[in-house]
Each structure stands twice: as structure tokens, then as C-alpha cells.
UniProtKB/Swiss-Prot annotation:
One of its GO terms (biological process) is aerobic respiration. This is Mitochondrial biogenesis regulation protein 1. GO terms for cellular component: mitochondrion. Residues 1-20, 94-156, 198-224, 258-325 are annotated as: Disordered. Pfam families: MBR1 (PF17058). Belongs to the ISF1/MBR1 family. The lineage of its organism: Eukaryota, Fungi, Dikarya, Ascomycota, Saccharomycotina. It comes from Saccharomyces cerevisiae (strain ATCC 204508 / S288c). The modification Phosphoserine is found at S177, S224, S227. Residues 99-115, 198-213 have a biased composition (Polar residues). The gene is MBR1.
């Protein structure tokens, strides 16, 4: 009876086919079918049992009669009926002949193909392998377009620089100050370069100067301070001391040296020598400013006029910078001119 079967051994594929042919499977047979690998987990035959059965079925239908081809002996030696399916087809089967050809023809064809592809000494390829690196095209399709695109920004830069240089040369010839040159640039916001035809306004008010300073323009007061021609005065800051009042030091050097040695600021002798000592003493104690404090725009002819009374000169001199102390540069200049 079926109940007397032992469940220790797993059922083979043939037994399972017999069970299917007999009729419906009982519960115990179902358990035996699903518990085959559980009963003996260390057995490898459970995994390859079905594959071996299929291989035996194929080998039973295979024709083992000898063939006329010389490759048949090699194929029979390598074909093992007990080996697995993956090992049944060796690597040498790639050279198997076709139905209409022979092995020698196939070997000759493969050798010719290999010689044409892998022959490094062939003169056709110049002694180099047939593989070549693909040429990569640049971003620009033509060289002319690349050159034009690279030259256009250079031309723009050159035109801007040339415009600035021309404006700098034209302004250096004249006596205009830099604030006057920037008046056109402050009013015209869109254009960065002054054109040749544009002439800036001669009148430059303080309001426009403050407007330019608010737009982070550091503008000097005079042209001599920022120009490259007047380098000594720009470096040492002596342009405000270069005035017609320095001529008075050459007119009367002895009296000016005495006054500088006594540390008496705001006291410089007049350009004309006096006959009486009373007038010179009264002039020394006066509160009038020295001739060094005159602005740049004063008239220089008043120092070269003929002798006049001291009272007239004292009334004609304006009182500029009465409370300013003389600097070391003024004293050194006075001593250098006096010597």
C-alpha cells in the first residue's frame, strides 16, 4: 500500500511521473514532493537530478554513428555522457565546419580575417594597428568664425583705449582742470568714453563736483596734482606753496631768516626795504598775513612795483589765514631760497 512507503528517500523524477500517471496525489506525496531538499540539505544530487534526467534523454536520442568529417573524433572524445550540459560544448566547437564547407576552409577563412585585421606590419596601415582615435570637432565649425568672434572684443577694447588716450592728449595740451573734463562724463551717464567732438563745459560748479564725489569719483583740485608731467610737486605736495609770495624771500632774505629763527609766525617783511626802523617794527607786530598765503590767482605785479609807503601796502594786502601756523615745509623752503 502507499501508506507503507518510507519518507526518508526523496522521490525521483521517474517515480513522480508514475505517480502522476496513476491518479491524484495524496497529502503525503505532496509533502514528499515539497520536502525533498529539506530531508537531505547536504545532498547535491537533489539540485541536479532533473537536469541529469534531461541529459540522459537527449543522449539516448543522439546518433553515435561515425561521420566522414575529421572533427568527429575530437567531438566524441570531448562529449562525455555523464558531464553537465555546460561542459558538453567545448571551446573548440567554435571552429566547427558548416554544412557545405570543411574545417580547412573555415580555418583558412579565419586566418585570413585575423591577418587582415591584426597584421601590424602591413604596408597598407603603415606599420600601425588599424584602430584610430576619433577626431573631436571643436565648438566652432569653421576657423573663420572663431577668429572673427575672438577679434571683435579686442577691437572694442582697442577703440575704447584709443578714445581715452586721444582725450587725455587733447586735454593735456590745454590748461583745463580734471573736474572740468569730468563734467561731461557726470552729466552723460550712458556713455563711458568722451567723444572727440564733445567739449566739456568750462564752468564747473561746486554742486556738480559734489555730485561726482557722491558717485565715488576721487577728483583732484588741480591738474598739476594728478598729471604725470608734474611729478615732483605731486609727490612732495608742494604745489600749494609755489606762489608769487615766495619772491619776497629773495627780495629780503636776511630779515626773513631772523623772523623764522625767532619762531614768529605770520611775520614776514615786506618786499620793499624801509628807511626808518619804526615802520619795520610796527609791520612785524601787525596781524597781516604773509605773502605765502596768497592764492594762486593773485596778481604778481604788486611785488615788482616801485616803492610805495608802507601804509598803502599794508592796506592793500588782504588778511588771509591769520590763524594758520607755518609748516615745516614752508620754513625749509624759506631757508633754501634765502641761502
Amino acid at each position: 500500500m502507499r501508506m507503507e512507503k518510507t519518507t526518508d528517500k526523496p522521490l525521483s523524477a521517474g517515480d513522480m511521473n508514475d505517480e502522476y500517471s496513476r491518479g491524484p496525489i495524496d497529502d503525503i506525496d505532496c509533502l514528499n514532493f515539497f520536502e525533498r531538499a529539506v530531508q537531505d540539505p547536504c545532498c547535491e544530487a537533489c539540485d541536479t537530478e532533473d537536469a541529469d534526467e534531461e541529459l540522459r534523454a537527449k543522449l539516448s536520442s543522439f546518433n553515435f554513428q561515425p561521420d566522414s568529417s575529421p572533427c568527429n573524433a575530437k567531438c566524441q572524445q570531448t562529449l562525455n555522457p555523464l558531464c553537465k550540459i555546460d561542459e558538453a560544448l567545448p571551446a573548440e566547437s567554435e571552429l566547427a565546419p558548416s554544412r557545405n564547407g570543411s574545417v580547412s576552409e573555415a580555418n583558412s577563412d579565419t586566418n585570413s580575417i585575423a591577418s587582415t585585421v591584426h597584421d601590424p606590419v602591413d604596408s597598407k596601415y603603415g606599420g600601425m594597428p588599424s584602430l584610430r582615435k576619433a577626431k573631436t570637432t571643436s565648438y566652432f565649425t569653421s576657423s573663420s568664425s572663431n577668429n572673427t568672434t575672438m577679434r571683435n572684443p579686442l577691437k572694442k577694447c582697442n577703440t575704447n583705449i584709443n578714445g581715452l588716450l586721444v582725450n587725455g592728449r587733447s586735454s593735456s595740451s590745454s590748461r583745463q582742470s580734471i573736474p572740468e573734463l569730468f563734467s561731461g562724463a557726470c552729466t552723460k551717464k550712458k556713455n563711458n568714453v568722451l567723444l572727440k567732438s564733445e567739449t566739456p563745459n568750462s564752468e564747473f560748479s561746486s554742486n556738480s563736483l559734489q555730485h561726482c564725489n557722491s558717485r565715488s569719483f576721487s577728483l583732484p583740485r588741480s591738474r598739476s596734482r594728478s598729471s604725470a608731467i608734474a611729478i615732483p610737486t605731486h609727490l612732495y605736495g608742494l604745489e600749494k606753496y609755489v606762489s608769487p609770495g615766495l619772491d619776497t624771500l629773495t627780495a629780503d632774505p636776511e630779515e626773513s631768516i631772523e623772523r623764522f629763527s625767532n619762531n614768529r609766525p605770520r611775520e614776514i617783511s615786506s618786499c620793499c626795504p624801509n628807511d626808518t626802523g619804526d615802520t619795520s617794527s610796527s609791520l612785524s607786530h601787525s596781524n597781516t598775513s604773509s605773502s605765502l598765503n596768497f592764492p594762486l590767482g593773485t596778481n604778481t605785479n604788486q611785488f615788482h612795483q616801485p616803492r610805495q609807503p608802507v601804509q598803502q601796502q599794508q592796506s592793500s594786502k588782504p588778511n588771509f589765514g591769520a590763524g594758520r601756523k607755518k609748516s615745516f615745509i614752508e620754513m625749509s623752503l624759506a631757508s633754501s631760497f634765502a641761502g
